[in-house]
């Protein structure tokens, strides 16, 4: 009798349990958003956000479609696509400038002041653009005349050119110069500078090179490395050696899935980047990378063009899409189009801070946790104050920099470390 009762009980209860499980599964991934390695609270907030604001949701109005804005480097991907391309150009000597144009490009808008004390040469002497510029001029001129790829009559193969002391000096000092400019001068000087090295190239040439660089970097091991200049060449700047250069890129499947889910629910997806627009368009648009962002939906830095080729001058009709310039670009291109601001913004750095806080319509701000100590890093503090709340505006996502991937937690493991951290030490009191 007891067995029969149990069987009857199971027959009644099992269907109810099955329904409950199905409802639970639906609530966990109701809109196709893959839990992946999202921090659970971050995932739940994003899923609820899409449900409420996407097509079929209570807040959705097809006459006023919502839109979101993502930063690109270190947000949608791991590491920086433009920095990877910069060093790929150096390694493969992919430049389209005469020595005269190169000399103009590396000096464009750079003050003659000494670089900060963090960027002295190996002998502890200060360096400035005049000193290192002279060394780079000499090295580039040698390579331009001797490497066959420049088409100036040289006979050296790439392998032969790379074996020269001039290439060793060129590689180390141009990479170092990028770091020294960024570490010494303001963002409006440093951000455009690297773009001027595309001078002489067409947009299509830049895109083709960016794709090659992406593919090479995606296959690379994630590591840091050191570059040192020639010890035998006579030079103005002296011997320079610097470590900490980052090798390798990684896609972030959680971000590509999120972008695709947003679009499938009628939420328009945009990217606002401080990299060159055409460089990011390659990574964000080509189907093989998985993000599928329309090219016209990428707002980025722009370099002036003459006769269809880039020249060493910023496009003075366009804003610099970094810091407050990101907000201005969104207002110019998107608020003017839609009549309202983005309902969500995604970023990782101080360069994204303004666009994360400047729009009253923004419901969600995703903070990729890089353990920053600036105003952007403080958004992570706000995220943890409202952690798990259904209406949280700021949400935090951790990652493991050793493998270039999200981790299912708000804490981040820095490269070379094993212990996860929630905030930069300076923010913890």
Predicted feature residues:
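Conserved phosphoryl-transfer catalytic core
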Residues: 86-179
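Non-catalytic pre-domain segments flanking phosphatase-related domains
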Residues: 12-17, 25-72, 80-124, 424-428
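C-terminal cap/substrate-recognition subdomain and adjoining C-terminal extension
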Residues: 29-47, 51, 57-60, 65, ...
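Active-site-adjacent helix/loop patches that line small-molecule binding or acyl-intermediate pockets
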Residues: 130, 134, 138-151, 181-205, ...
């Amino acid at each position: 009798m007891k067995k029969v009762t149990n069987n009857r009980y199971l027959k009644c209860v099992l269907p109810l349990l099955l329904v409950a499980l199905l409802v639970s599964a639906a609530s966990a991934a109701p809109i196709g958003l893959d839990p992946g390695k999202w921090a659970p609270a971050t995932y739940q907030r994003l899923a609820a956000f899409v449900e409420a604001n996407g097509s079929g949701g209570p807040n959705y109005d097809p006459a006023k479609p919502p839109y979101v804005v993502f930063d690109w480097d270190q947000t949608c991907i791991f590491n920086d696509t433009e920095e990877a391309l910069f060093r790929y150009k150096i390694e493969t000597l992919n430049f389209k400038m005469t020595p005269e144009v190169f000399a103009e490009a590396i000096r464009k808008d750079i003050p003659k002041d000494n670089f900060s004390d963090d960027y002295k040469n190996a002998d502890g002497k200060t360096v400035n653009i005049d000193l290192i510029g002279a060394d780079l001029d000499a090295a580039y001129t040698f390579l331009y005349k001797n490497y066959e790829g420049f088409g100036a009559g040289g006979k050296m193969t790439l392998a032969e050119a790379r074996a020269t002391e001039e290439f060793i000096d060129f590689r180390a000092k141009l990479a170092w110069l990028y770091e020294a400019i960024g570490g010494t001068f303001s963002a409006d000087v440093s951000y455009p500078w690297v773009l001027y090295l595309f001078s002489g190239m067409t947009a299509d040439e830049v895109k083709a090179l960016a794709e090659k660089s992406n593919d090479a970097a995606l296959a690379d091991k994630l590591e840091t490395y050191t570059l040192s200049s020639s010890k035998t060449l006579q030079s103005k700047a002296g011997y320079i050696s610097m470590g900490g250069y980052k090798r390798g890129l990684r896609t972030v499947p959680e971000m590509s899935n999120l972008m695709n889910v947003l679009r499938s629910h009628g939420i328009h997806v945009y990217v606002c980047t401080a990299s060159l627009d055409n460089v990011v368009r390659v990574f964000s648009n080509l189907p093989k990378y998985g993000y599928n962002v329309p090219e016209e939906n990428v707002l980025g830095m722009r370099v002036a063009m003459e006769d269809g080729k880039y020249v060493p001058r910023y496009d003075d009709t366009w804003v610099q899409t970094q810091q407050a310039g990101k907000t201005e670009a969104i207002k110019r291109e998107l608020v003017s189009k839609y009549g309202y601001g983005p309902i969500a913004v995604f970023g990782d750095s101080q360069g994204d801070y303004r666009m994360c806080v400047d729009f009253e319509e923004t419901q969600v701000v995703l903070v990729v946790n890089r353990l920053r100590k600036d105003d952007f890093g403080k958004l992570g503090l706000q995220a943890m104050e409202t952690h798990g709340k259904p209406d949280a505006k700021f949400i935090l996502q951790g990652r493991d920099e050793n493998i270039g991937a999200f981790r299912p937690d708000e804490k981040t493991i820095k490269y070379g470390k094993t212990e996860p951290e929630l905030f930069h030490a300076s923010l913890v009191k």
